[in-house]
A protein has these predicted regions:
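Bacterial C-terminal helix-turn-helix
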Residues: 3-6, 10-68
């Protein structure tokens, strides 16, 4: 996994993708994966992600996931 991450980071730097954009995309994909794994259940997804349900809900809205 470390090698894949290093390769991805190098590619993003070469493409001049800024840290804010990279972090935003990572967070969005991470949340979407947790929601998919839990069948869209935000309470379960929040537990999987280790965040409070309200925090997850705010991020779902922020990233326009699940129809928001």
């Amino acid at each position: 996994m470390k090698e894949k991450l290093e390769s991805l980071v190098t590619e993003m730097i070469d493409r001049r993708i800024y840290l804010d954009e990279a972090l935003n995309e990572f967070e969005k994909k991470f949340i979407q994966s947790a929601l998919t794994k839990t069948g869209g259940n935000q309470t379960k997804a929040a537990k999987v992600l280790g965040v409070h349900r309200n925090t997850l809900n705010r991020k779902v809205i922020q990233h326009k996931l699940n129809g928001h």
